[in-house]
A protein has these predicted regions:
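Extended redox/cofactor-interaction regions of prokaryotic respiratory oxidoreductases
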Residues: 1-63, 73-83, 91, 159-257
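Catalytic, metal-anchored helix/loop core of enzyme active sites in primary metabolism
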Residues: 66
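Electropositive
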Residues: 71-72, 282
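Glycine/threonine-rich phosphate-binding loop and adjacent beta-strand/alpha-helix elements that clamp
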Residues: 75-102, 112, 117
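Long, contiguous, secondary-structure-rich segments that constitute the structural scaffold
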Residues: 97-159, 230-248, 252-350
Length: 350
């Protein structure tokens, strides 16, 4: 398969012609909140021919789905961590069994994806290949078991499951260059694609800081430890305490604009505008403002996240511009967005 930067998704949906996206499968995601120009993507999703979501939440994105297929909850399925092992400083293994039996009519997310794939194959009048049939019958537990047996655990899931606290296999050990699949067993750091960008980097550095109009500020994002992703806002324990939704602004920048701490302000960029509460903070550099990721759940009709919709705040990605991308990967630029700040709600667009 292949992939494209999500910053192109809105245009791929809205641009007519061959290859236009008319259907979408969303799996445990909320791109309306998490991608540049989220308000434009929100409008584009409403024009799809069909959308299906595998999700436990009706959020800003899945509210557009024709069908929502909720998988089992996190305590109804077994778990072996993969992502956070990439951040580990020691070699560990831990198998977490399901705490509760899943209801008879419930399916795990991998089962939902499998059954959708089978249904699509049959709808095309085709039959699954022998390879596909074999893959579809293998549950994640069997895959993890096989990988553990060829690794340092040498005992599979059954051995790891006997140790609820996990197994510490000691400090990390280098596996290079053996794991490299290149003919020379070396990593080519001078590939033509990044090197072409490096050649132009000096030109960008010579330009100096981003040129701003006299009344413009630079917007940057931030994430908090307890609610760093949008879906965590639906957990009261993770959002309790001091409010964290505000736009942080240096006191001098507020004073220049006749704004005081706690005021509602209008923030406008080249691609959108929002209204949000501001907070004076000397932690911010003059000329820079900061808004946290993932807020603004209450601004969209149809969002059914009981706690999240009660939280104040606005989405930073209603201000980011999907046309501003990094040259090599084409991923969106999420920081350093020029914005203007004014008291009160926004006026009509310029």
């Amino acid at each position: 398969g292949s992939e494209l930067p999500v910053s192109t998704l809105t245009d791929e949906i809205l641009t007519p012609g061959e290859g236009q996206i008319r259907g979408l499968v969303s799996i445990a995601g909320n791109p309306v909140s998490s991608t540049p120009g989220g308000h434009r993507l929100d409008e584009a999703l409403g024009g799809l021919d069909f959308m299906v979501a595998i999700d436990i939440y009706v959020n800003e994105t899945t509210r557009h789905a024709d069908v929502i297929l909720p998988p089992t909850g996190p305590l109804e399925r077994e778990h072996y961590d993969l992502i956070f092992h990439t951040l580990a400083v020691r070699n560990t293994a831990r198998w977490s069994p399901a705490l509760f039996e899943k209801p008879d009519d419930a399916r795990h997310d991998w089962e939902v994806a499998r059954d959708l794939a089978l249904a699509l194959i049959r709808a095309r009048g085709e039959k699954p290949s022998v390879v596909d049939q074999g893959r579809f019958r293998v549950p994640p537990r069997m895959i993890v078991d096989g990988l553990l047996r060829v690794g340092p655990v040498r005992g599979g899931v059954k051995k790891v499951a006997k140790r609820p606290g996990g197994i510490d296999l000691g400090p990390l050990e280098s596996v290079l260059p053996d794991r490299l699949q290149t003919p020379t067993k070396r990593i080519d750091l001078a590939h033509e694609v990044p090197m072409s960008a490096v050649a132009e980097l000096a030109d960008h550095l010579d330009v100096g800081p981003i040129r701003l109009a006299p009344d413009e500020l630079l917007l940057i994002g931030r994430r908090h430890q307890r609610d760093n992703n949008s879906w965590l806002h639906n957990a009261p324990r993770l959002t309790k305490g001091r409010a964290r939704h505000q736009l942080l602004v240096h006191p001098d920048d507020l004073a220049k604009r006749g704004i005081v701490d706690g005021d509602e302000v209008s923030v406008r960029s080249a691609s959108g505008q929002i209204v949000v509460e501001c907070a004076a903070s000397e932690d911010m550099m003059r000329g820079v403002v900061s808004l946290p990721h993932g807020y603004g759940h209450g601004r969209k009709a149809g969002v059914r996240m009981r706690h999240a919709v009660t939280l104040p705040g606005a989405s930073i990605n209603d201000l980011t511009d999907p046309s501003r991308t990094e040259q090599v990967s084409a991923n969106g630029v999420l920081n350093g967005v020029p914005v203007t700040l004014a008291p009160g709600p926004p006026g009509p667009p310029a």
